[in-house]
Amino acid sequence: MESTLSAFSTVKATAMARSSGGPSLPLLTISKALNRHFTGARHLHPLLLARCSPSVRRLGGFHGSRFTSSNSALRSLGAAVLPVIRHRLECLSSSSPSFRSISSGGGSGFGGYNGGSGGGGGGGSESGDSKSKLGANASDGVSVPSSDIIILDVGGMTCGGCSASVKKILESQPQVASASVNLTTETAIVWPVPEAKSVPDWQKSLGETLANHLTNCGFQSTPRDLVTENFFKVFETKTKDKQARLKESGRELAVSWALCAVCLVGHLTHFLGVNAPWIHAIHSTGFHVSLCLITLLGPGRKLVLDGIKSLLKGSPNMNTLVGLGALSSFSVSSLAAMIPKLGWKTFFEEPVMLIAFVLLGRNLEQRAKIKATSDMTGLLSVLPSKARLLLDGDLQNSTVEVPCNSLSVGDLVVILPGDRVPADGVVKSGRSTIDESSFTGEPLPVTKESGSQVAAGSINLNGTLTVEVHRSGGETAVGDIIRLVEEAQSREAPVQQLVDKVAGRFTYGVMALSAATFTFWNLFGAHVLPSALHNGSPMSLALQLSCSVLVVACPCALGLATPTAMLVGTSLGARRGLLLRGGDILEKFSLVDTVVFDKTGTLTKGHPVVTEVIIPENPRHNLNDTWSEVEVLMLAAAVESNTTHPVGKAIVKAARARNCQTMKAEDGTFTEEPGSGAVAIVNNKRVTVGTLEWVKRHGATGNSLLALEEHEINNQSVVYIGVDNTLAAVIRFEDKVREDAAQVVENLTRQGIDVYMLSGDKRNAANYVASVVGINHERVIAGVKPAEKKNFINELQKNKKIVAMVGDGINDAAALASSNVGVAMGGGAGAASEVSPVVLMGNRLTQLLDAMELSRQTMKTVKQNLWWAFGYNIVGIPIAAGVLLPLTGTMLTPSMAGALMGVSSLGVMTNSLLLRYRFFSNRNDKNVKPEPKEGTKQPHENTRWKQSS
């Protein structure tokens, strides 16, 4: 650790780049006006809509490159507004409800004052924190999510060899940089090369090209429509398709087992010595041939044909092995029946029983796959189908039930007790408690009142709420989570790369072993073990054993070992408020040995409260004017109203509590620097808010500045206020430590994980929090800026540490991105969630323990699956080849081998499903007291002023 700290001290002076401010006030005003105007025009006359269409086409040319003006501000305004107008008109002309609020969302991030954690930014509005509250990656603009990838729904994959072939086919295309294929979810995600994105409408054209190519190669594929309105329909369609395939599989299974039962009846009557005329018909060769043909041409037809087609196209799969085994048994038996003098045995019953056992295994496997996706289906089911739309503002007489997918931005919906919230939005009137457990995993209900954010799918428990819609349908936070989790499930864990290499060559290896088995027993077996022939010929025994080798091999178990465990793990996490973006993240997270916490908003609650405004004792000596507390708050709030930083929010709340006059920063003057502060022109005065260094940089002077540092005690941080070239005041804050922070740190330490804390605060404030939560002061790094946090993470990594960084604000974004695993608190800034592969949607530190335990249990399950899959094939193939025949006289018939093959796949699926129970039995936070969530009743901190709700 000492080497890390010493190395870090050499880079601590790194300068941090100045970030630009948010959009100017006029641009936001125009955006809001457009939003109100067009969302209010949903019921325009069709003639007017038709007349809008030519306008849409004409607006197509008004992009930034073609809208020219000598005025740079006008060019910027045109480039920003005209695409929005075009999008709105397109929505109207197609009667589409896909409006999005463009006026919400935080800005570019605001620095941590005197070491605050940072976050927020310019350009936010009264709903600026909606992104962070309603989920990671909740978009506030008109962009389409997942804009850099192509998702394909791929059918016809039956084993690991199939998924490896699909990946190889995709990556062989020049437009594809890399691809990832998930056998369990039957999807492929493609990352194209940069050159492919230069083509207009490249996603649609390239997606169709790749899908057609896969279809021609034997894998029926369709490109996924990435438009959010269609996402839920796609997900529902896939679920219905799986259910339909399961029903079809059930019918085929019933027919095959009926035929198998007839075969077994014949054997049973022969064994019992039953002698009746109809028994002779059942034992006749012609009857057995008929049963075998009906099986191969009926329930086994698809299986056999798919296997032969795959073999001819150079990508053999498990169906190829089963098909070859069944056809070989039928061919040899037919030859033996037609030429009795060969002395070969006939075993027409083997293909019948083989197909029956294989179809049984497939049916159980399909059921297990549907069960594995039940968590995702459960997430989808939390969204209601109907909503009560409020018309004319009359709650009593003007509500009408409408489909939820028809809701638009700006609509008002009424939510009665017991109803599920139909869309993401903001409460306009009413007060109630909301159950968000299906969304965040938070067991405690949360109080909601006017101005509170609500998420689609949460349950209204008592009062009536009127909510303004901000996002609906696939644009909701639940939709984002489902979409991100599905993409995460298609991201391969590094361990999967070994499996892909084996699975891609596995089928060829099995066919080679089958040929070797036939050669050995046909040429040498009779000499080595003549008693094994049982009055048959060497050729008959060799053919039977070689067929058993083909059938017993199970590439499907290899292909399912990793993706099924990842599917269950990520889906299980999503249902419990843990967003884990990929199998590679689960694997890394399971190996973490160092956890670095940000202080503000992570170890503390992130809701600082103004406790005191301090004016210098001799203001006339340092200032041109004397400033009152009200004036200081009024000026500081004018600057902070442009941010969503917790400190900024606290200042604005304090100003409102004192009924300060509302002032605004002059347009285009707001500037900020994460980790330092912000400055703007207010009422012709340059107002600086931030750290002491920041205020000095902007010209504030006076010896009393240093004396004011003494006011920063314990966990109370300060922000300096400068007006022009003078110090106006210092504002003190208090931010309480999370109730579960100490227990989480203790738990991590007990597991042998090194725990550090990074903070932009001064040493005494950071040490106070460290003392409360139990972090050694030697592992507290205070007074650091965002770039320095990133450098510290890099130093730990140079010392071979696997680092997880836990943070919540834009100040943490660089450190989160550079760590091995970035963990964002769900209530933090959107940028933190966007760069973090792990998001704790419930905004509770105990979820960190859940996420780590889930990753460990998932990887443990993956390893168990791989041991089983490899072990089964390593043991099963030699037994099928007759290795026990000289020792014990034991051999596997093709039908017995088929039954074992089904059991192997089912074992992998069952073990993956058991992950649910293992996770709950090993959770580390059973004794951790749940932390009261924001909005629940709890004692208020003692402050100088009572804060308004």
Swiss-Prot record:
Inactivation phenotype: High-chlorophyll-fluorescence phenotype. Short roots.
Q: Which residues form the HMA domain?
A: 148-222
What Pfam families does this protein's entry cite? E1-E2_ATPase (PF00122), HMA (PF00403), Hydrolase (PF00702)
Please give the residue ranges the record annotates as the region Disordered.
Answer: 113-142, 925-949
Reaction(s) the record says it catalyses: Cu(+)(in) + ATP + H2O = Cu(+)(out) + ADP + phosphate + H(+)
Tissue-wise expression = Expressed in the shoots and roots.
A cellular-component GO term for this protein: plastid
Under the heading InterPro entries, the entry gives: ATPase_P-typ_cyto_dom_N, ATPase_P-typ_P_site, ATPase_P-typ_TM_dom_sf, ATPase_P-typ_transduc_dom_A_sf, HAD-like_sf, HAD_sf, Heavy-metal-associated_CS, HMA_dom
Q: What is the effect of changing residue 904 to T?
A: In strain: cv. Landsberg erecta
Q: Does the keyword Chaperone apply?
A: no
Q: Has keyword Nucleotide-binding? A: yes
Q: Where is the transit peptide?
A: 1-103
Q: What is its EC number?
A: 7.2.2.8
Q: Which key words are in the record?
A: ATP-binding, Chloroplast, Copper, Copper transport, Ion transport, Magnesium, Membrane, Metal-binding, Nucleotide-binding, Plastid, Transit peptide, Translocase, Transmembrane, Transmembrane helix, Transport
Q: What does this protein do?
A: Mediates copper transfer across the plastid envelope. Required for the delivery of copper into the plastid stroma, which is essential for the function of copper proteins. Seems to be selective for monovalent copper Cu(+) transport. Also plays a role in glucose signaling-mediated cell proliferation of root meristem in non-green tissues.
- What protein family does this chain belong to? Belongs to the cation transport ATPase (P-type) (TC 3.A.3) family. Type IB subfamily.
**What is the protein's name according to its record?**
Copper-transporting ATPase PAA1, chloroplastic
